[in-house]
Amino acid sequence: GKYLWNVYNDFDIFIADAKGKIKKQLTYTKGYDAEATVSPKGDKIVFTSMRSGDLELWTMNIDGSNPQQITYGLGYDGGAFFSPDGKQLVFRASRPKTDVDIEEYKSYLAKGLVAPTNMELYVCDVDGRNLKQITTLGKANWAPFFHPSGKKIIFSSNHHAEKGYDFQLFMIDVDGNNLQQITTESKFNAFPMFSPDGKKLVFSSNRNNNETRDT
């Protein structure tokens, strides 16, 4: 069968304190509001929303006010993060091009599903301008995160793999040049994030799980 993700209609975004106590609900629109990350200054949130009828990126203030649509292309835009200076966004997108792929995407979305097997990485200004696709690798390229310098992006990809489950970490310049493989171990490495000084990485892996798929 095909690998599918659920897009839950009742997902909303909340603010909680450091102990997990919910302080405020930020979104109330019908449909999927999720995948939220906060800007470096702590004043803005970027998130994925279905409120326009498609899975697009939006921003809002930290208190939930002033929602602004950022992306407009048909397809699933998600997993966005701010650049260290808060001026750019990096995200992964699955954007169907052929009539067959477009029809399949719309059919799945109507059932609250997406098929995230073909995803590329994009960058844009925080207001959506200067949108640029920075990978054309094929397969699934996702979980992007800026290096603290703002000049490189680390991400997870299976573009190199014969089998789809072999995800490794790669780094690429923000303009799409100088692809470099970072990890080689195990079958799954994803969700990388840099330490503030850029010298260390934290990421998820299943390398020590006795050949199971627990991560």
What are these regions (language model features)?
Residues G1-T215:
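Sequence signature of WD/YWTD-type beta-propeller architectures
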